Every structure is written in C-alpha cells, then in structure tokens.
Amino acid sequence: MIRKAIARVVERQDLSEAEMIEVMDQVMSGGATPAQIASFITALRMKGETVDEITGAARVMRDRALPIRVGKSVLGIDRDDINLDRETILDTCGTGGSGTNSFNISTTVAFIVSACGVKVAKHGNRAVSSSCGSADVLEALGVNLDVTPEVVERSIAQIGIGFLFAPALHGAMKHAIGPRREIGIRTIFNILGPLTNPAGADCQVLGVYREDLVEKLAQVLKKLGCRSGFVVHGSDGMDEITLTGESTVAEITADGVKLSKVTPEQFGLERAPLTELHGGDAQGNAVIVRDILSGKDGAKRRIVLLNAGYALVATGKAKDVAEGIRLAAETIDSGAAMKQLERLVALTNEAE
C-alpha cells in the first residue's frame, strides 16, 4: 500500500482517511522500509497534509499507544455544550517547534488547571527546537519520568495530574525515528503527538507552530472526539496564545469549530516583548516554573494566566476567559498550584 500511496501523493493526490490508516498501519507495524517512510512523509509534507490524512494517522497512533486508564471526573461548572456525564481529562500538549525560545508555558498551565480540580493528562516529550521540552523541565523540577503506566494512572487519579512521556507510550513510533531524523524536516509526525494522548483526553488546548495548522488541527480534534478545546498560534510564532500581539484561536465546541483573533488587551493584560517570555535550559526553566507557581509577577505570569484562562474554559471550570484568568491567579496565589507540583514530584519518586 505504501508504494501506491507514495505514487499518489507525489502527484498531489489526497488520500482518504481509510487509506491513510492502511499506510500508517504498515509504517507502525514495521512493514515499510526506512526509504519508503522517508519518501512518504516528505511527499506528504510537500503536498500538504489534509484533515482526513492527519485524522487517519492519529487514529493508528492512538490504537497502537500503551493506554493510560483514568477514572471519571465531574466538571465544576455546568456548560450547555459539555456533557457532564462523560469523563473530563485535559491535555495541554502542543506541537513545539516554534523556534521562539519560550519557557514551558503549557506545562506550567497544567499544574494550575489541575489545582482547580480538573484531571490533567499532560502528554509530552523532550525538546523539539528549543533547549527544553516538557519532559526536560519536569525532570529538572524533580519529577521521575521513568515510571510505569500504573504509576501515571495512580498519579492522575490521586492528585489530578500525571505526565505521559511519549517515547514510553508510543513504542510503534520506533520505526519512523530513523527516517525522521535523517531527513531533518518537519513532517506529519511533528503534529501527531498532541493528537494522540494515551489517556484519551477529551478537552485540549493545543498550540501549533504554524498558523495554517490552527483550523486544520481543530477539525482533526473534532473528528477524533474532542468535546471542547482550543487550537492556538501566536503571530510571533509561539505555539501558545501570546502576549506580544495577536493570536489565532480555533474553538472546538459541540456545534463545530469557530476561528477568531485575540489580543492580550481584550482580557486586560499588558503586552510584552518576546524577550520577556524567553526561557533557557532545563534548569533555568525549572526556576521560572517555580517562580510563577510561587506567585512571582511579570510577563511570564501573565502569559501563563492567559493560557490557563483558555484551558479553564475548555474544561468548563470557567464561563469565559476573563473568569478563567481570575481563577488561575487565585489558584497560584493560594499556593495550590505549587502544591500540585510538589505532590507530583513526591508520588513519582515514591514509585521507585
């Protein structure tokens, strides 16, 4: 199948979701050669991946992931577009690869949202383009990444947050590692991670490194069963809602996908230059995360509050972003968010 798929994609013909599933099954089962994998993902990148193609690939990755089973939780605020009888799990995993050298914003957000009573299954990996990915900063903060799926499940169930280390849960990806590394360009695999949470997160805030991916990945998440969420991109290139200027936001609701542009001023937040949002290596970013969770003021706190505000809307904990920002600020200042970090560090290290 992959040889036929390569020939079609080279001719700029789109594959159906079913055809993409067949190709990715071949890739992830070891049935395709490294040359075939490299040729296929390069041709796909040049053509441009469609919603159906990304959806099909994500379904295969989800099916082959080691599952993380999480018990049911109940939302704190009744929103008409969210079914309270269903499980609510949030992921704040983004694509990375923004090249803006920002600190770990979505990881910081995860602790705040979990302290608000939302179960968070934070999916992540080591650095893509920066010097510090979510796994790197969590390790520097003292979180033990080398734990069993059962420990991750217990962590989410008992304290409301767990880290899903992608390499440990997506073993079938090993067949694509070599070709991806050797061709050295962004491909469909750079956007699949946030779409394939092994805990089946049904609420997401997903940051992307290209504006044209915003609506596309929102449509993919909708097809994959996401009940509520946002796909976001900053005009400065950040895979977050930025403080430097305008951001593109796609909201996912029961009614579909709605695209909008937002600025910090809409929420009473002062803009900041990108330099004030820069991070560093894992140890430096760990200091930044601790500072924010300890209540330190400044641009880094503001961008975390803004993104946390959206996450709290996605999960139904806030009626709007302004309320979400207020709740996030209160949660930090009460010490509850820092407590979540301390509990995650303790639980993952007890498991050794």
Curated annotation (Swiss-Prot):
One example GO MF annotation: anthranilate phosphoribosyltransferase activity
Residues at which Mg(2+) 2 binds: 239-240
Binding site for anthranilate 1: 94, 125
Catalytic activity of the protein: N-(5-phospho-beta-D-ribosyl)anthranilate + diphosphate = 5-phospho-alpha-D-ribose 1-diphosphate + anthranilate
Enzyme Commission designation: 2.4.2.18
Database matches in Pfam families: Glycos_trans_3N, Glycos_transf_3
Cofactor(s) needed by this chain: Mg(2+)
Binding annotation for 5-phospho-alpha-D-ribose 1-diphosphate: 94, 97-98, 102, 104-107, 122-130, 134
GO cellular component: cytosol
Superkingdom of the organism of origin: Bacteria
Keyword field: Amino-acid biosynthesis, Aromatic amino acid biosynthesis, Glycosyltransferase, Magnesium, Metal-binding, Transferase, Tryptophan biosynthesis
Gene Ontology terms: biological process: L-tryptophan biosynthetic process
EC class: transferase
InterPro entries: Anthranilate_Pribosyl_Tfrase, Glycosyl_Trfase_fam3, Glycosyl_Trfase_fam3_N_dom, Glycosyl_Trfase_fam3_N_dom_sf, Nuc_phospho_transferase
List of residues binding Mg(2+) 1: 106, 240
Description of how the protein assembles with itself and partners: Homodimer.
Function description: Catalyzes the transfer of the phosphoribosyl group of 5-phosphorylribose-1-pyrophosphate (PRPP) to anthranilate to yield N-(5'-phosphoribosyl)-anthranilate (PRA).
Family according to the record: Belongs to the anthranilate phosphoribosyltransferase family.
UniProt protein name: Anthranilate phosphoribosyltransferase
Species per Swiss-Prot/TrEMBL record: Geobacter sp. (strain M21)
Taxonomy of the source species: Bacteria, Pseudomonadati, Thermodesulfobacteriota, Desulfuromonadia, Geobacterales
